[in-house]
């Protein structure tokens, strides 16, 4: 997950509203992590990122 923090720092570090919603942040990172694994749902991850 640390790799995602490097590429998407605003998801976990920069925005004050993110600090108030760590569960939502964890959910987004979990979706992105799932997309990285073989057979993961890339479409879902792209929708979240977009």
Swiss-Prot record:
UniProt membrane topology term: Lipid-anchor
Superkingdom of the organism of origin: Eukaryota
Residues anchoring lipid (S-farnesyl cysteine): 47
Record PTM Cysteine methyl ester, positions in chain: 47
Location(s), subcellular: Cell membrane
CC terms in the record's Gene Ontology section: plasma membrane
Molecular function in Gene Ontology: mating pheromone activity
UniProt keyword list: Cell membrane, Lipoprotein, Membrane, Methylation, Pheromone, Prenylation
Primary subcellular site in the record, as a coarse category: membrane
Record's keyword annotation contains NAD: no
Protein name (database record): Mating-type pheromone BAP1(3)
Organism per entry: Schizophyllum commune (Split gill fungus)
Gene that this polypeptide is encoded by: BAP1(3)
